[in-house]
Amino acid sequence: MADLEEQLSDEEKVRIAAKFIIHAPPGEFNEVFNDVRLLLNNDNLLREGAAHAFAQYNLDQFTPVKIEGYEDQVLITEHGDLGNGKFLDPKNRICFKFDHLRKEATDPRPCEVENAVESWRTSVETALRAYVKEHYPNGVCTVYGKKIDGQQTIIACIESHQFQAKNFWNGRWRSEWKFTITPSTTQVVGILKIQVHYYEDGNVQLVSHKDIQDSLTVSNEVQTAKEFIKIVEAAENEYQTAISENYQTMSDTTFKALRRQLPVTRTKIDWNKILSYKIGKEMQNA
């Protein structure tokens, strides 16, 4: 082990540490960071060399953050990344600095938004917030309106998590939806992601995603938003149901094929009585 450590350069150590951090399960960033910190034993090297990993983790996970003075949380995503550690809160029309390690937002300031698409963005956000409130107990959503390749585009992001460290599990749902505002009809593209980590008496991770495509009728802002939410709700309900049914099937078939619940004798052993079984047999043979 010592020889291996001597062979690794600082650059290689940081690269390995960054991979651990980026792949940390939901709600376990701090635990993974602290473990990596102990292994690397060089705080300056870790902070400087793995800073990109901290940022990438928060962007990938749609990390929610509360901005002081504002009621609703906003998601940290690539769509709101303004560069130099600054992010956009499109609902409140503010920009803020975000510390990727501490996960804290500071220095909120007024920020310009894409006015040409703002009425569409607001309508979608209003409808999406009502949907998220109904379906996600801890859900947060952020809706962006921007021009991409000259086209007015709406991007809607949803995040919901449950961190139950005391019960040895953590999980996060993420979904991202996108469509351009074009006459008559447009295509909606979505991706749904689920990640769950269970670590009591074992170490099991569920990592799943599904790509979605559907057609959306474009009329006025409010009606288009309603039709968009119908697509989102149908797809996410179907995905959640499929995941639940799949794991029930695996429990009933695959897991049972991998391991017997009962030993070959088809009877359970009472381990509290195993000693008395042996003593009783020896007494009979005496």
From Swiss-Prot:
Positions bearing Phosphoserine: 9
GO-annotated biological processes: actin cytoskeleton organization; barbed-end actin filament capping; protein-containing complex assembly
Q: List S-S links within the chain.
A: none
Keywords from UniProt, A to Z, are: Acetylation, Actin capping, Actin-binding, Phosphoprotein
Q: So where does this one cross the membrane?
A: none
Which superkingdom, per the lineage?
Answer: Eukaryota
Q: Which residues carry this modification: N-acetylalanine?
A: 2
Q: Which Pfam families match?
A: F-actin_cap_A
The record's PROSITE patterns line, in alphabetical order, gives: F_ACTIN_CAPPING_A_1 (PS00748), F_ACTIN_CAPPING_A_2 (PS00749)
On whether Protein biosynthesis is a keyword of this UniProt record, the answer is no
Q: Annotated Gene Ontology MF terms?
A: actin filament binding
Q: Quick one: a GO cellular component term?
A: extracellular exosome
Q: What does this protein do?
A: F-actin-capping proteins bind in a Ca(2+)-independent manner to the fast growing ends of actin filaments (barbed end) thereby blocking the exchange of subunits at these ends. Unlike other capping proteins (such as gelsolin and severin), these proteins do not sever actin filaments.
Show the PANTHER family listed in the entry. F-ACTIN-CAPPING PROTEIN SUBUNIT ALPHA (PTHR10653), F-ACTIN-CAPPING PROTEIN SUBUNIT ALPHA-2 (PTHR10653:SF2)
Q: Quote the subunit structure annotation.
A: Component of the F-actin capping complex, composed of a heterodimer of an alpha and a beta subunit. Component of the WASH complex, composed of F-actin-capping protein subunit alpha (CAPZA1, CAPZA2 or CAPZA3), F-actin-capping protein subunit beta (CAPZB), WASH (WASHC1, WASH2P, WASH3P, WASH4P, WASH5P or WASH6P), WASHC2 (WASHC2A or WASHC2C), WASHC3, WASHC4 and WASHC5. Interacts with RCSD1/CAPZIP. Directly interacts with CRACD; this interaction decreases binding to actin.
Which protein family is named in the record? Belongs to the F-actin-capping protein alpha subunit family.
Protein name per UniProt: F-actin-capping protein subunit alpha-2
- Which gene name does the record give? CAPZA2
